[in-house]
A protein has these predicted regions:
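Conserved serine/cysteine hydrolase catalytic core
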Residues: 89-141
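Short beta-strand immediately N-terminal to the catalytic nucleophile in serine-hydrolase-like folds
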Residues: 1-3, 28
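Gly/Ala-rich beta-loop-alpha elbow adjacent to hydrolase catalytic centers
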Residues: 3, 7, 11
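Flexible "cap/lid" loop of the alpha/beta hydrolase fold
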Residues: 13-17, 23-55
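Helix-loop "lid/cap" segments that line or gate small-molecule binding pockets
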Residues: 48-54, 65-77, 85-89, 101-108
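Glycosyltransferase donor-binding loop in the core domain
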Residues: 54, 90, 134, 158-164
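Short, well-ordered alpha-helices that flank and scaffold nucleotide-derived cofactor binding pockets
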Residues: 16-20, 140-144, 171, 175
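Catalytic active-site module of serine/aspartate enzymes centered on a nucleophile-bearing elbow/loop
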Residues: 148-183
Length: 183
């Protein structure tokens, strides 16, 4: 199973709660969630405020706001054409769906899996961009809690390493899956 960011948290949750169904996991720019109730509550408040802004200011404002978050700053290297394409794809989202995602599926709504990492049975590849300092720290923490973890730091990439350096991410994933299949 492979997941990026929020999708990675969902994939990790499945690997934790149903280890018999997950042979291996690839997490790109992901975490096991917030550790404390206070952190989750703060994130829920932040996501609710962002959902309100999306409703009041509209989808264009939201997409521009999202694309300009410091987390995605490294994507500037993709160039104007790729950024315009990404913006266009994001503008095709349903605003009501985005609001529902923020309020119902955001990190603050998801449980913490930090205390349950030992339930994961299969190997896990943690992929993180070398410029994504926050998620690099989180990958180190994740790796220490997972019995069969391997970390791949992708050069010249930030949070969305698969967008910023697809060849390196693809090579790491293929190599990992080849090793998993050989077991």
């Amino acid at each position: 199973m492979l997941g990026y960011s929020m999708g990675g948290r969902i994939a990790l949750g499945l690997a934790v709660r149903h280890p018999d169904r997950v042979r291996s996991t690839v997490l790109v720019g992901s975490t096991a969630g917030y550790s404390t109730d206070a952190e989750r509550a703060a994130r829920r408040r932040s996501d609710a405020a962002l959902a309100d802004d999306l409703i009041e200011r509209g989808l264009e404002w939201f997409v521009d706001h999202w694309m300009n978050l410091p987390l995605f700053e490294s994507q500037e290297r993709l160039g104007n054409h790729a950024l315009a394409e990404a913006r266009s794809l994001r503008l095709a989202n349903d605003p009501d769906g985005l609001v529902a995602s923020l309020l119902g599926s955001g990190t603050g709504m998801q449980p913490s899996f930090w205390g349950e990492l030992d339930a994961v049975r299969g190997p896990v590849l943690l992929v993180v961009g070398d410029e994504d300092t926050r998620y690099r720290r989180l990958a180190v923490r994740l790796a220490s809690g997972l019995a069969l973890a391997q970390t791949e730091v992708v050069p010249e990439a930030g949070h969305a390493a698969h967008l910023e350096n697809l060849p390196a991410v693809s090579a790491a994933v293929v190599e990992f899956l080849d090793r998993v299949d050989a077991r």
